[in-house]
Design a protein with these regions (language model features):
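Membrane-interface helix termini and inter-helical loops of multi-pass transporters
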Residues: 25-33, 62, 91-92, 141-151, ...
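Loop-to-transmembrane alpha-helix entry segments
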Residues: 43, 63-70, 100-103, 119-139, ...
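Hydrophobic transmembrane alpha-helices of multi-pass small-molecule transport proteins
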Residues: 51, 73, 113, 122-143, ...
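Glycine-/small-residue-enriched transmembrane alpha-helix faces in small-molecule transporters
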Residues: 1-41, 147-179, 183, 194-198, ...
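Specific transmembrane alpha-helical segments of multi-pass solute transporters/efflux pumps
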Residues: 18-19, 23-24, 52-103, 113, ...
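Structural signature of hydrophobic alpha-helical transmembrane segments
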Residues: 32-49, 88-106, 151-163, 227-238
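Transmembrane alpha-helices of multi-pass small-molecule transport proteins
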Residues: 8-10, 31-82, 107-113, 164-171, ...
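Helix-loop interface residues and adjacent transmembrane-helix termini in multi-pass membrane transporters
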Residues: 33, 93, 119-121, 178
Length: 240
């Protein structure tokens, strides 16, 4: 995958920030009303096949070579199964704002994983940037740490989700791909969504749609749309 111009990267980062900000409060409502498994099952069931249809319609290379399937499975298990489930479960225990900030520890973990896996040098500039980012997160959390201490499982789940996202990002960068970004995102969602769909049928009862409020329905819609739009954007920005 070729690196795009810096201006494009900045625009994409801005788009991710807006989508991310809209996504978390809505996702929390949907996760609480429907249950985390049901909510995520709906998102991946819509987004995965939808992205593959879009890739085929755009005549983008979309069928991976045989050697690529284990790599895509790794991406799916980390970036879809791990990230989607852990973050949805975290949202039933902590607020959307706190979850979003914890989720944004991903670059910290990605930098450490890249140093170990890709042998990328963690020089003074990068270390300083990571330290500055971590300090900024602590400032955002100021005054709310006591509340998070009362929900340690929610914090642990969200940290696990951020770690899964970091593994997905570094793995995407580590391998070469002969399919496009949209198709790669779609196959991740299809393969990573299979465990979610199976667990949903086993662990969670049929959803009571009568409990779904207008806010919950909006949360499902925004969550599914973010899954469609967000994963390709994340790959374009962070995995280069």
């Amino acid at each position: 995958m070729a690196t795009g111009p810096p201006t494009l990267a900045l625009v994409l980062i801005g788009a991710i920030s807006v989508l991310w900000g809209l996504n978390w409060p809505a996702m929390r409502v949907a996760s609480v009303e429907l249950g985390p498994w049901t909510f995520r099952a709906i998102c991946v069931a819509i987004a995965g096949p939808g992205l593959l249809v879009i890739a085929a319609h755009r005549k983008e290379p979309w069928w991976p070579r045989r050697m690529a399937w284990p790599r895509i499975a790794l991406l799916g298990l980390s970036g879809v199964t791990g990230w989607q489930l852990l973050s949805a479960m975290a949202l039933t225990r902590i607020g959307g704002g706190a979850a979003a900030i914890i989720g944004y520890t991903m670059p910290l973990w990605a930098a450490l994983i890249s140093a170990l896996w890709l042998r990328e040098r963690l020089d003074l500039r990068r270390a300083g940037a990571l330290l500055l980012g971590a300090s900024g997160m602590l400032v955002l959390f100021r005054g709310g740490l006591a509340g998070l201490a009362e929900a340690p499982l929610g914090v642990a789940l969200m940290l696990g989700a951020a770690l899964c996202w970091a593994v997905n990002t570094v793995a995407t960068k580590a391998f070469s791909w002969d399919i496009g970004v949209i198709a790669l995102s779609g196959w991740q969602l299809v393969l990573g969504g299979i465990p979610i769909l199976l667990a949903w049928r086993i662990l969670e009862p049929d959803p009571d749609l009568s409990r779904l409020t207008a806010a919950g329905l909006a949360g499902v819609s925004i969550g599914a749309q973010w899954t469609v739009d967000g994963l390709p954007l994340v790959i374009l920005v962070f995995a280069h």
